[in-house]
Amino acid sequence: MNNRSSVLQVGNTSYTYYPVSAIEGHEKLPYSLTVLLENILRLAPNDEHAAKLADRLVQAGLSGEVGSEIEFSPARVLFQDFTGIPVFVDFAIMREACIELGGDPKNINPQVPCDLVIDHSVIADEAGCADALKNNMALEFGRNKERYEFLKWAQESFKNVRIVPPGVGICHQLNIERFAQVVMTREEDEKKVAYFDTLVGTDSHTPTANGIGVLGWGVGGIEAEAAALGQPITTLVPRVIGVKLTGKLSEEVSAMDVSLTFAQMLREEGVVGCFVECFGEGLNSLSATQRACISNMTPEYGSTCTLFPVDEKTLDYLRLTGRSEEHIALVEAYAKAQGFWNDPDSTQRVYSKVLEIDLSSVTRSVAGPSRPHDRIDVTRAKQAFDRICSERKLDTEKTVEVNILGETQELSHGALAIAAVTSCTTATDASMMLAAGVLARNAQAAGLHPKPWVKTILAPGSRATEDILDAAGLMPALRDLGFYTCGFGCMSCIGNSGPILPFMHEIANDIELASILSGNRNFEGRISPDVSQNYLCSPALVIAYSLVGTMDFDFETQPMGVREDGTEVFLRDIWPNASEVKELLDECCTKEVFDRAGEGLFEGDEAWRSLGKEASDVFAWDPESTYVRRAPYFDGMTKKPEAPKAIENARVLLNVGDFITTDHISPAGSIASDSPAARYLEDHGVTVQDFNTYGARRGNHEVMMRGAFANVKLTNKLAEGKKGGWTKDFLDGEIKAVYDAAKHYQEQQIPLVVLAGKMYGSGSSRDWAAKGPMLQGVRAVFAESFERIHRSNLIGMGILPLQFEEGENVQSLGLDGSEVITIASIDFSRGLPDPSVVDVVATKQDGSKVSFKAIVRIDTPTEGAYFYNGGILQYVLRSLS
């Protein structure tokens, strides 16, 4: 493998690159493994190591099975502010710890480009009015000034860091519009080196970039920290599922409908931990942004990525969004040289399994009421709603009266409290947003208007999206229906919906209210604590549902309203014409629009520019701060790690069921006034109206550890029927807040464990879903299965992930959570756990014992090294000190 590099001539420029063609069998690898192979060839420290890792990858890839451990070093890291601020807080703490261990604090600095976009903090406090955007931005800045000052310090004090100020857009949309290069270049030894653009991000929807041919995925903040500091990510060579796309979409169907179809099909298939990539002649009918919409939904079916190869559609998008012709020529030449150019057939590529989706069979869809993969055909949405009510034992005849502007209205289960056109999932694709605007214009012409109990929210993913709607002349119709832009950020998609209308809040416990949004997540309790049912769909359908004000509606048979002439209006009468949308797209979605939207990307408004923080090696902590505090992760840390010991006489903190999401474990939304976190804030002089959200408080471990397992919708079997963040304290027999019980156990030096079912840790790449439990004293989590990112996060924080053996679970073992649990010691000194299946003894209250074995889900030697060190940050800190 001597001379791993070669020269690629593009026009008058010569590029050094690392051809995968040097490796036998490369042409049969899936596209995604080709990217990993190039990464190995380029970054391995010597030929021997490169040959070893390349052989592992190729052997696994050609077998279609999971392979051995390889290393992956992403070209860059993407952050959003909720998960990014804790990262830079950790860096600040690590700098201090580095000094204490005798090292240079400047060693704690990102080694690769890092972009942080402030998109998670804006809340739809106001909506449906002309001043909503201005007022929400002012409120956002007022609440978050302290956090933003910290980010200004981070930008000045760390190299390789760029921060996009608030009010610009969503990180994933800006990533494909502005940051992603598809092929990157750098100067090295007076040569220009070309290589695949790759990334990891601290948001689970990072795979959005897969749609334009950029391999990347979501990781927890702690894993992203290590990657930013130059630590390779280790992973087993994954199984790769090929999705063959055939046919083309019918005119009324959107990319969101395809995304929901993917989520349903692939979650049923079971692709957790797999790579997914798309091929087939159906790709030719999908634009780059439609592909990005599909890729955005990746975490909702559990795969690591959903990659599309590069083709002319990719180049068209790069051209549209302002990349130079020289760079576009490089992308084309490099993709073709590396076998990454779209081959519609791809029959020679080896996949673990091939699934097929006929795009012409996709129908208009919604998904809900609490899982993105529970797809429903719109024509059967009314029947599905009736079934959901029956399953929940809801009286569909029940009504409640509300007074709206002097008129009495009767509402029943399924009444819409929120209709939100929001999220990078759909705003990325201009055709979907234009379709929503056309439907709004048609509805306006027919005399239709959203019901007065619906809070209407429009949150474009970037300034370009609003500019396109404006250029098409559709913003006036949207505003007339109450869809005023109220923020350029994630908003409802992450639960920043703000308060629902007061009279709706008053009846939230009497009937099950619903929300409808064009986002990617609808988990229980996520969109609003007052809303019990959440549904996902395309932007046009969001507006359509706002016009009828309920999920209890059949668009096929029920009229949405009556025109002035007495004729009935059905959805089919106002649905956008595909040819008109295409004309508007061609006319209004232009390079000039994207160029204007990209001007001053990093400058911010006057409020942002006025923030002043000088660079310094260490951060000056404010002891009075309730937003940014020094966490105790490294207190008492020694240069050499202590070997992990057996976990003896542990108590069960929670006993939960299937599909416990990271939202359940560490909520991002509002802080309940009766919660331990609220008590802490009030004790520190913070009034209820200034609580902000858990997500905004992630720089303060005191708030976040009190917020662990505090989701108001959490069901814990130990809480004796009490819903929310409650558990039983077996030391005194009381039902109390989870944090209060955990604190009591910690005072008695009693370790804690969690019992769970399938898919534990699904959802967001939330490192606080591991940090919070760790600070509460949780040492291990037992589950039937773990979602990929959360399992990594647990290891990264020194929590042991233990999986029940096949056919066993909490119920089959007869566990109820009252047991005292002992887990035998495990040796990690050689990397992989020894034993890989550990003995566990659960002692019941009557003294009887249940003995069983659990699989230690520490899958690679590197993960073992992290756990041996007490966590990934401790490992990295020791290596840099």
PLM region spans:
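Mobile "lid/hinge" segments at catalytic clefts and subdomain interfaces of large enzymes
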Residues: 188-335, 341, 432, 440-452, ...
